[in-house]
């Protein structure tokens, strides 16, 4: 029997009413929960403080966004389109890491919280991104920080993307340092009325990653589904949503490598 892996994705504004109660109740019952937040550190801070006292292994992920930072730098994606870094993913990683570290909240708990440094990146640049991820994970390790990458859009990348030399190198690093380097994925159905549409092409796509790892004799990485749900702007009514959540939760429960999955979204207009 495994605990429910489904948690929530939150951010600035929005509708996090009740999230504190949700966290306290589960923590009190010693049940791990999953929480992802972008830009707004408050909910993660609350969760990490609970964790310090209880030692329940909650899954906490934080990301800094371009929109949230609003300083002219693109925090969402690496500088892979910058001519200076087109052939230098390691240099791109160093720049991106410097920028990210400068924005990291002082309360960030390096022991308990995963940092997600990029989001919905270019599926055609897998080898570049794999090399970028290796350097990022090594820079993070020096700072005592845990990272989870790449937060691919639902339906991406192509399975062959995982087999590029850079990606395989990152997957081997994850296998070597599972407590410090992990893989982040997004899984949406893009439909409100059929959560398993085209399964496992969208929801369930993590299985392609595992197949590639198995093929190359690489232990499967720790996985965070840092966004999942129906569509970007809508969720179905509770009588439809709850069974969908249960069914997707049962799918993820079968794979011990999946640590948590954050429902999109406790944000504005939801």
Question: Across the structure, where does each feature detected by a protein language model lie?
Answer:
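A structural motif corresponding to the C-terminal end of an alpha-helix
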Residues: 103-112, 136-145, 173-179, 209-221, ...
């Amino acid at each position: 029997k495994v605990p429910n892996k489904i948690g929530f994705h939150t951010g600035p504004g929005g509708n996090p009413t009740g999230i504190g109660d949700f966290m306290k109740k589960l923590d009190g019952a010693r049940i791990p929960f999953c929480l992802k937040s972008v830009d707004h550190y408050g909910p993660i801070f609350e969760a990490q403080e609970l964790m310090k006292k209880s030692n329940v292994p909650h899954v906490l992920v934080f990301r800094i966004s371009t929109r949230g930072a609003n300083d002219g730098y693109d925090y969402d994606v690496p500088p892979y389109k910058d001519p200076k870094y087109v052939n230098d993913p390691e240099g791109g990683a160093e720049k991106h890491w410097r920028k990210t570290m400068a924005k990291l909240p002082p309360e960030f708990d390096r022991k308990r919280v995963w940092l997600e440094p990029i989001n919905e990146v270019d599926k055609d640049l897998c080898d570049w991104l794999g090399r970028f991820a290796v350097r990022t994970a090594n820079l993070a390790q020096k700072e005592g920080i845990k990272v989870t990458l790449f937060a691919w859009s639902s339906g991406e990348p192509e399975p062959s993307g995982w087999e590029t030399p850079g990606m395989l190198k990152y997957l081997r690093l994850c296998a070597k340092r599972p407590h410090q380097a992990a893989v982040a994925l997004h899984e949406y159905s893009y439909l409100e009325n059929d959560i398993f549409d085209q399964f496992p092409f969208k929801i369930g796509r993590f299985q392609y990653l595992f197949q590639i790892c198995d093929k190359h004799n690489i232990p499967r990485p720790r996985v965070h589904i840092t966004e999942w749900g129906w569509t970007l702007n809508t969720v179905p009514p509770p009588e439809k949503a709850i069974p969908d959540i249960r069914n997707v939760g049962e799918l993820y429960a079968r794979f011990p490598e999946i640590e948590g999955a954050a429902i999109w979204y406790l944000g504005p207009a939801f």
